[in-house]
From Swiss-Prot:
Keyword Transmembrane: yes
Membrane topology note: Multi-pass membrane protein
Main location: membrane
Name this protein carries in UniProt: Protein AaeX
UniProt entry tagged with the keyword Cell membrane: yes
Gene that produces this protein: aaeX
InterPro entries (alphabetical): DUF1656
Transmembrane segments: 3-23, 39-59
Origin superkingdom: Bacteria
Family: Belongs to the AaeX family.
Sorted UniProt keywords: Cell membrane, Membrane, Transmembrane, Transmembrane helix
Location(s) in or outside the cell: Cell membrane
Database matches in Pfam families: DUF1656
Length: 67
């Protein structure tokens, strides 16, 4: 359970996990931008599956930081 409060933006209520999702999405774009020039995607069998797993790992790390 997150200790962050519920965010209200322009009258819309967002759960505390929304901030964690946005942070992990930003980290995902940075890490993917770093990995693409290295050529690691040539060794990956399914790039979309790799990206999904990478995002899940980053989301897990982000949620562990906030809990």
């Amino acid at each position: 359970m997150s200790l962050l409060p519920v965010m209200v933006i322009f009258g819309l209520s967002f759960p505390p996990i929304f901030l964690e999702l946005l942070i992990s999405l930003a980290l995902f774009f940075v890490v993917r931008r770093i990995l693409q020039p290295t050529g690691i995607y040539e060794f990956v069998w399914h790039p979309a599956l790799f990206n999904t797993a990478l995002y899940c790992c980053l989301f897990y790390l982000t949620s562990r930081l906030f809990s």
